[in-house]
């Protein structure tokens, strides 16, 4: 045997083969969440991501209006009477853990309506909690301008702070006046029913919804939430011109996300005029069919269809 060459180890070879075969069988057949997660990642490999149905043009938005567009998942771009707000930005093809050579996590089912390079300079970024589908470090590092940031309690350590003019964490029922070059805005954190851990062990991280007020006009952002009577209590902070509520990832219920019907009911309890369904048509995070959340939302509002502000990624709404 040549010097330095290791002898062939038949037992090690067989053991490695059996281990790989077992892992493959487990991934293919197991009903566990982890096996389904890896099966989904394998299916995504090489899959094209379709373009969003609509593409907003913020350069044409009028500053005296209240205008917003759904960019995908929970990400909303708002022109709040001249002040640009971006909520829970996820603007890249995949979310999850950054491994250096790539990101391990779900791939988008639909492209964002706008990429970071397409955004106007942002004045304020809101982050409701630290879950990867709401707090995406790559997206937060790519926001144009030098915005202020308001985040849920104990989440700002995940933010690339050098890109931001100021960073403020809020606990439930705390509020702050955020001053920007385009004027001020009041942000209040509200309690919702969810959880904040990013990697399961950091259960101390906060989570919240937000109420945003400017010149007497108010918007309610529900973040992620399960069904809760809290939104009836939040009514006292209204009236709200629109409630931005999650309607997807409810099957199974253990993820603590409300159903579309529950989301509509909570927005009604809060007294919101318009309903904006979020958290669907973007990532496969649960078991319900792709279009089921919006179909159930439309059915829940069948008697008041004018209250449904939008249904497609990229759609733009103007509230004069």
Residue spans for each PLM region:
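C-terminal segment of N-terminal export signals and the immediately downstream linker at the start
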Residues: 6-7, 28-61, 67-69
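Active-site metal-binding loops of divalent metal-dependent hydrolases
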Residues: 89-91, 130, 192-193, 223-225, ...
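Metallo-beta-lactamase
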Residues: 42-63, 151-217, 295-319
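Catalytic core of the metallo-beta-lactamase
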Residues: 71-79, 178-241, 254, 261
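Active-site HxH/HxHxD metal-binding segment of metal-dependent hydrolases
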Residues: 93-100, 113-178, 190-191
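Cap/insert and terminal regions of metallo-dependent hydrolase folds
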Residues: 4, 8-12, 16, 148, ...
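N-terminal export signals
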Residues: 2-6, 12-33
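Pre-active-site segment of Zn-dependent metallo-hydrolases
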Residues: 53-60, 80-126, 137-142, 196-198, ...
């Amino acid at each position: 045997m040549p010097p330095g060459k290791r002898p062939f180890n038949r037992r090690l070879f067989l053991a490695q083969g059996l281990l790989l075969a077992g892992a493959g069988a487990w991934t293919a057949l197991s009903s566990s969440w982890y096996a389904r997660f890896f099966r989904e990642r394998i299916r995504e490999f090489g899959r094209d991501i379709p373009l969003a149905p609509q593409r907003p043009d913020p350069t044409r938005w009028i500053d005296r209006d209240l205008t917003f567009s759904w960019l995908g998942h929970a990400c909303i771009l708002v022109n709040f009477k001249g002040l640009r707000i971006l909520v829970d930005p996820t603007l890249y093809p995949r979310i999850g853990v950054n491994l250096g050579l790539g990101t391990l996590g779900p791939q988008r089912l639909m492209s964002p309506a706008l990429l970071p390079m397409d955004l106007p300079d942002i004045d304020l970024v809101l982050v409701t909690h630290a879950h990867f589908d709401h707090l995406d470090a790559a997206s937060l590092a790519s926001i144009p301008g030098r915005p202020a940031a308001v985040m849920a309690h104990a989440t700002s350590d995940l933010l690339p702070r050098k890109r931001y003019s100021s960073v403020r964490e809020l606990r439930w029922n705390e509020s702050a006046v955020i001053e920007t070059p385009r004027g001020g805005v009041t942000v209040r954190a509200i309690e919702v029913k969810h959880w904040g851990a990013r990697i399961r062990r950091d259960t101390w991280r906060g989570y919240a919804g937000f109420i945003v007020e400017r010149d007497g006009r108010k918007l309610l952002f529900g973040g992620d939430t399960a069904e809760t009577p809290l939104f009836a209590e939040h009514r006292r902070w209204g009236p709200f011109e629109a409630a931005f509520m999650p309607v997807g990832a409810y099957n199974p219920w253990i993820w603590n996300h409300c159903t579309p019907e529950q989301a509509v009911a909570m927005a009604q309890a809060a007294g919101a005029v318009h309903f904006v369904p979020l958290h669907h048509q973007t990532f496969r995070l649960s078991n319900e069919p792709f279009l089921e959340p919006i179909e159930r939302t439309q059915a829940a509002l069948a008697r008041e269809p004018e209250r449904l502000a939008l249904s497609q990624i990229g759609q733009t709404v103007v509230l004069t």
